[in-house]
Design a protein with these regions (language model features):
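Boundary/linker segments flanking structured domains
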Residues: 1-36, 40-48, 54-158
Length: 158
């Protein structure tokens, strides 16, 4: 649920950011950058900001927070989206009709999962089986490899 800020390549510009996640290690990652829903910014264990995206731009909104007044204040984020992941691994369209019971249960689940209140003994209803864990953006791995190779070349040249 807590995704690391440093595993996203923010250098590509807000419209090209990828927010990658998967349910299991053997799956190709899904890009959640065009998700809609709510998100939380965290500094360690403390939640410092709650926001929403009602158009498909979660990645762009998070990227904006890397440059605004909150930029130095968060190192992790959580998000809760409305667009389902289809069997093809891409985001589908959000449903348009939600019953009151589902909305209330979802609100409770988001509060329980996001705030982790110590007196709640269970997870929020309906959250199991729908959680995706973060996948590091492969471009960051490539950047690390290039930096390592450059350091090795520089140390040999001395």
């Amino acid at each position: 649920m807590f995704w690391r800020r440093d595993l996203v390549d923010w250098s590509v510009g807000s419209n090209a950011v990828r927010v990658l996640g998967r349910q299991s290690q053997d799956e190709d990652p899904t890009d959640f950058a065009r998700q809609i829903g709510v998100y939380l910014l965290h500094d360690g264990a403390r939640t410092i900001y709650a926001g929403r995206v009602s158009s498909p731009r979660l990645g762009a909104r998070l990227a904006e927070h890397t440059k605004d007044r909150l930029s130095g204040r968060w190192d992790r984020f959580s998000w809760f989206g409305l667009r389902p992941v289809l069997s093809t691994g891409v985001l589908g369209e959000a449903g348009s009709n939600f019953g009151t019971d589902l909305v209330v249960a979802t609100m409770e689940a988001i509060l329980i999962e996001g705030l982790e209140p110590p007196q709640n003994r269970r997870q929020g209803d309906g959250m199991t089986g729908q959680e995706f864990t973060q996948a590091e953006d492969p471009s960051l791995q490539e950047q690390d490899l290039i930096a390592t190779l450059l350091r090795q070349l520089q140390s040999r040249g001395r």
